[in-house]
Amino acid sequence: MSPAAPVLAVDIGGTKVDAAVVTADGEVLRASVARRPTGRDTPREGIAANIRAAAVEALTAVPDVRVAAIGVGSAGPVDLPARSVSPLNLPQAAGLPIDEVLGGLVDGPISLALDGTCIALAEHWRGALVGAENAMAIVVSTGVGGGLILGGRPISGASGNAGHLGQTFVRTIDGDGVGDAVAATLEAVAAGPGSVAWARTQGWVGETGLDLAASYRAGDEVAVAAVRRSATAVGQAIAAAATLCDLEAVAIAGGFSHVADDYVARVAAAAAAASVHAYARRCRVVPSGLDGDGPLLGAAALALRT
């Protein structure tokens, strides 16, 4: 990143929107951090108002800081040509025009990207992917997202949704026989809600990802199987991505990636087992090098590239 003025970073998610002012060297100004709710049932006008309110709060908290640009990372899908977002968990916000929502707040450009692209940018800037020219970041949480860095640059694709790995299909074994193989999206199989739902069909009586983590630590057989099932699916998807894109490294982030201490190791083993070619097996699978500020750092990195 070249020297530049601070930027406003905005991260739009399915339950909340975060905003903060971030310096050119990656310092999130703590006084500026702001959060507002979004939510599936929130009206479109309310979502737009809360996005803008979070941005305004962040800016007004540091009135002496000159902000040069805005970077926005959003849950997908996004539409970069239309400059709009349509987060799957915010049906009321389909086609929300970002320039209208955030226009006029700063005297500078507004950059938009998929949240997965922003996470990849953040990992490449200050996290686990520093120095990797061809890499991917994957977030395993209530959903599964991802972003790509190829040739040292973020890849957006035609609409802005390159790297949206969660909606690709994987083949997972739910039992011991070939007849138990099913095809499903990576997100349905590997994300926290899907893993919890599957465990409950197997007789597990917990309710949340935190419950599943506790059961895993206690050695509960179903919880162990659910974690293994999730990690195997993520590993299969990584093997496909590494084969297609010749990746050097993949960073795993997201709350559900902490469901077990050995989750990333399980993903790495599954990726190696599913890779046909040696070059794909050489792809390193590593934990995220970021803290909870990762999405904001990614949105800031996006703005700083402008």
Can you name each region flagged by the protein language model?
Residues 76-78, 89, 116, 141, ...:
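Short, flexible active-site-adjacent loop segments at beta-strand->alpha-helix junctions, enriched
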Residues 1-69, 78-82, 100-110, 122-132, ...:
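ATP-binding/phosphotransfer module of carbohydrate and carboxylate kinases, centering on a glycine-rich
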Residues 33-35, 89-90, 159-160, 170:
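Short clusters of small/polar residues that mark proteolytic maturation junctions
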